[in-house]
From Swiss-Prot:
Protein name: Aspartate/glutamate leucyltransferase
Reactions listed under catalytic activity: N-terminal L-glutamyl-[protein] + L-leucyl-tRNA(Leu) = N-terminal L-leucyl-L-glutamyl-[protein] + tRNA(Leu) + H(+); N-terminal L-aspartyl-[protein] + L-leucyl-tRNA(Leu) = N-terminal L-leucyl-L-aspartyl-[protein] + tRNA(Leu) + H(+)
Family that this chain belongs to: Belongs to the R-transferase family. Bpt subfamily.
Keyword Magnesium among UniProt keywords: no
MF GO annotations: arginyl-tRNA--protein transferase activity; leucyl-tRNA--protein transferase activity
Taxonomy, superkingdom: Bacteria
Entries under InterPro entries matching the protein: Acyl_CoA_acyltransferase (IPR016181), Asp_Glu_LeuTrfase (IPR017138), N-end_Aminoacyl_Trfase (IPR030700), N-end_Aminoacyl_Trfase_C (IPR007472), N-end_Aminoacyl_Trfase_N (IPR007471)
Organism: Bordetella petrii (strain ATCC BAA-461 / DSM 12804 / CCUG 43448)
Gene name of the encoded protein: bpt
Gene Ontology terms: biological process: ubiquitin-dependent protein catabolic process via the N-end rule pathway
Major localisation: cytoplasm
Record's subcellular location: Cytoplasm
Keywords for this protein: Acyltransferase, Cytoplasm, Transferase
């Protein structure tokens, strides 16, 4: 276990996990660098950690720390300068009938049912398609930072999508989103656009989208939200030519 001097947390320590199978690149082994102890990571500390390329899963705050791979790149959208492309504008128009309801984290059988249908429909065999209620709650409903749950419902009140968002000092961090896998249109794209609009409303400059991987189809959508910054070599910067 070691302390990282470049991070401004005298009381936090950072350690590397043992290797485990990579969730995104088949055949690869991954490691994570974990910030601990978790109870010291409040909203302010977490905002600074996100600026250093970290994100969280439940109470687990981490960033990639693989031995021979740097494929996972933290990315964030410049919300003030963002301009949607044609397909994004179409997704935005196509879901204008949805209403968003922002709430505190709370258990809901309706949410869990939608989560289960989403995992089974979009990520079958991915390991999360049989998550128990406890696993779901630990993953999405457990937080020590400033987190919100957003419901999206249609005109009849039917739940179409749920998004979990962390509110940071300089932006929003998109934690996880799940939606009706049978729905038409690009609900995932609409969700990111909605979060960008929320950043603008709150005068927050950045929307953090987690990690982008060039060779992962699951991550490809993130490169479409421009201008995008990448966290490379310890600093946020514009994508080098040919990166995206």
């Amino acid at each position: 276990m070691s302390q990282l001097k470049e991070l401004p947390f005298a009381t936090l320590q950072f350690y590397s996990t043992a290797p485990y199978p990579c969730s995104y690149l088949p055949g690869q082994q991954a490691r994570s660098q974990v910030a601990a102890p978790g109870h010291l990571i409040n909203a302010g500390a977490y905002s600074q950690l996100v600026e250093q390329g970290f994100r969280r899963s439940g109470l687990f705050t981490y960033r990639p720390h693989c031995d021979n791979c740097r494929a996972c790149v933290p990315v964030r959208v410049d919300t003030a300068r963002f301009a949607p492309n044609r397909s994004q504008r179409r997704a935005w128009r196509g879901h204008q009938g949805l209403r968003a309801f922002v709430a505190e984290l709370a258990w809901s059988p309706e949410h869990y049912d939608l989560y289960t249908r989403y995992q089974q429909g979009r990520h079958p065999g991915g390991g999360m398609d049989d998550d128990s209620r406890t696993q779901y709650a630990q993953f999405l409903l457990t937080s020590r930072v400033n987190t919100r749950l957003v419901e999206f419902r249609d005109a009849e009140g039917t739940l179409a999508m749920v998004s979990i968002i962390d509110v940071l000092d300089d932006g929003l961090s998109s934690v996880y989103t799940f939606y009706d896998p049978a729905a038409r249109g690009s609900l995932g794209t609409y969700n990111v656009l909605w979060q960008i609009e929320q950043c603008r409303t709150l005068d927050l400059p950045w929307l953090y989208l987690g990690y982008w991987i060039r060779d992962s189809r699951k991550m490809a959508y993130k490169s479409g939200f421009k201008p995008l910054q990448l966290y490379l070599d310890g600093a946020w910067q514009a994508p080098p030519p040919g990166t995206l």
